[in-house]
C-alpha cells in the first residue's frame, strides 16, 4: 500500500501516466505481468452524457456482462445444434455459469449499491444522468467504478478531493482492508498515514523508497537530507584541498607526479550533487481600499439553475468576517458563491453588494482548455507588468521556470491552481471568495 509523495510539479501524475502507458518514458521500459489487472483514477477523466450513474458503475463489470451475453447466445443456438455441438455448448455454458457465480455476478447490484452508498452516491440517486452531476459528484462516480473493479493494483490520483468527511472515513476503511496493492497520490496527510505502509518520494526525477507511513518518511527524510548536506560539504572541502595542491605543485618537477596522482584521484571521485533547496511558495494578497461595513446582504435568496436547489435563505456578510461554507457535494456551495458574486441570477430573492467592493474569486477548476503558457496567461491579464515582474510573481507561488513556460493545460492540478492564485495576488482585493483553494495543492503550499 504505497503513498507516492512529492511537491507539485515533481512528476507524480506523470509517473502514473508512464506506468499506465498514457505517456512514453524518455528511457527504459515499463512491463506489467500478463495477468495483472490495473485500475487507474486519473485527475482528468470524463463521463459519457446520456448514461445514468448505475449504468456507468455497471461498466466496471463489463467482462462479466459480456460472459453472460455469450452464455445467453449459446442458449439461443442450442435449438439448432447437433448432439455433438450441444454437448460442447453445455460444457461451455457450465464453465461460464461457474465463473460468474464464483465472481459474485449475481449479487453485483448489491455490491454496486454498497460502494456507491459508502461514497455518498446513494443520496444523489443512481438513476440520475451523469451529465447532471457537479464536478465533485462526477469524481465520486469515477472513484466508485474504480473501486468496484477490484483490480490487482489501484493507481489513485488524489481520490479524496471532493469527498466529504464521512466518505473519506469510508474510503479509509476500504483501503485499509484492500487485499491487493495500490499506489496513492494524496496531499491529505491524515488520510495517507491511515492507509499506506510504504512511501515513494519523488524529488529531482529520483524515486526513493521508505518503509512506514508519511510521518515516518518525514523523520527519515530529514536525517537523509542532513547527511547529504554534510557529505556534500566534506567532499567540497576535499576537492578544494586537492585542487589547491594540484595548482601549487603541477609546474614543479619535483612534485609534478604527486600532482598528477591527486588529479587522477579527483577525476575518479564520484561527485555528490548539491542538495537543492525546496521552493516554498508565499501567498500575499494586495489589499484594496476598505469597503463598506456590509459586504453582502441576501434576502429570501433561492439558489439554482432551472430548478431551486435550496429553500429561501437570508444572511448578511460583514467586513472582517471569515466564513466557511460547508455541506455535502452537489448541495449548491459553488452556486451560492456564483450567485452572491452576481455571476448567475438567483431563482428568486435578492442580493445586495456593499460599496467599494473588489472581490477576488478563486474558482474550483478552469472550464476551458487553456492553451496559453503560465507566463502568457498572467501577462495577458496584467499587461502593464514587465516580463521579469510576471516571472517573479509566478516563482513566488512556487513555480519553476519550466512550469512558467509550459502551457497551462499540461500542468498538474496543483501547478494550475498556483497560476490562478498568482493572478489573484496581483489584483487589489478587499473580499476573497475561495472555492476549494487547497484541492491539488502540496503540503507546503497548503500550509502557506
Show the residue positions of the predicted features:
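Post-kinase regulatory C-tail/linker adjacent to protein kinase catalytic domains
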Residues: 283-285
Amino acid at each position: 500500500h504505497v503513498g507516492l509523495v512529492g511537491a507539485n510539479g515533481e512528476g507524480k501524475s506523470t509517473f502514473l501516466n508512464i506506468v499506465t502507458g498514457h505517456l512514453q518514458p524518455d528511457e527504459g521500459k515499463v512491463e506489467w505481468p500478463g495477468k495483472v489487472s490495473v485500475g487507474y483514477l486519473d485527475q482528468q477523466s470524463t463521463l459519457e452524457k446520456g448514461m445514468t450513474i448505475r449504468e456507468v458503475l455497471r461498466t466496471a463489470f463489463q467482462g462479466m456482462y459480456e460472459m453472460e451475453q455469450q452464455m445467453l447466445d449459446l442458449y439461443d443456438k442450442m435449438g439448432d445444434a447437433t448432439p455433438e455441438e450441444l454437448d460442447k455448448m453445455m460444457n461451455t455454458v457450465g464453465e461460464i455459469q461457474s465463473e460468474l457465480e464464483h465472481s459474485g455476478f449475481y449479487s453485483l447490484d448489491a455490491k454496486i449499491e454498497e460502494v456507491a452508498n459508502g461514497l455518498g452516491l446513494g443520496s444523489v440517486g443512481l438513476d440520475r444522468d451523469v451529465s447532471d452531476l457537479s464536478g465533485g459528484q462526477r469524481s465520486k462516480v469515477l472513484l466508485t467504478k474504480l473501486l468496484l473493479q477490484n483490480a490487482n493494483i489501484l493507481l489513485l490520483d488524489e481520490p479524496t478531493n471532493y469527498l466529504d468527511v464521512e466518505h473519506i472515513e469510508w474510503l479509509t476503511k476500504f483501503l485499509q482492508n484492500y487485499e491487493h496493492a495500490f499506489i496513492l497520490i494524496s496531499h491529505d496527510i491524515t488520510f495517507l498515514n491511515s492507509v499506506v505502509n510504504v512511501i515513494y518520494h519523488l524529488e529531482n526525477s529520483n524515486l526513493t523508497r521508505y518503509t512506514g507511513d508519511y510521518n515516518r518518511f518525514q523523520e527519515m527524510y530529514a536525517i537523509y537530507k542532513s547527511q547529504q548536506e554534510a557529505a556534500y560539504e566534506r567532499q567540497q572541502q576535499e576537492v578544494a584541498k586537492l585542487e589547491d595542491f594540484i595548482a601549487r605543485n603541477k609546474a614543479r618537477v619535483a612534485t609534478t607526479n604527486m600532482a598528477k596522482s591527486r588529479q587522477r584521484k579527483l577525476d575518479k571521485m564520484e561527485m555528490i550533487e548539491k542538495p537543492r533547496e525546496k521552493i516554498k511558495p508565499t501567498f500575499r494578497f494586495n489589499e484594496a481600499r476598505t469597503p463598506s461595513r456590509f459586504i453582502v446582504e441576501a434576502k429570501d435568496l433561492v439558489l439554482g439553475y432551472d430548478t431551486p436547489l435550496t429553500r429561501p435563505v437570508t444572511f448578511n456578510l460583514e467586513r472582517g468576517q471569515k466564513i466557511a461554507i460547508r455541506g455535502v457535494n452537489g448541495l449548491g456551495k459553488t452556486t451560492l458563491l456564483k450567485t452572491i458574486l452576481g455571476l448567475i441570477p438567483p431563482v428568486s430573492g435578492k442580493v445586495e453588494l456593499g460599496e467599494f467592493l473588489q472581490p477576488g474569486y478563486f474558482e474550483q477548476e478552469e472550464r476551458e482548455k487553456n492553451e496559453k503558457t503560465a507566463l502568457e496567461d498572467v501577462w495577458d491579464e496584467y499587461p502593464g507588468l514587465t516580463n521579469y515582474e510576471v516571472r517573479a510573481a509566478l516563482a513566488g507561488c512556487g513555480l519553476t521556470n519550466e512550469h512558467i513556460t509550459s502551457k497551462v493545460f499540461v500542468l498538474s492540478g496543483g501547478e494550475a491552481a498556483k497560476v490562478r492564485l498568482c493572478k489573484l495576488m496581483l489584483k487589489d482585493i478587499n473580499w476573497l471568495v475561495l472555492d476549494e483553494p487547497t484541492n491539488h495543492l502540496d503540503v507546503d503550499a497548503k500550509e502557506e
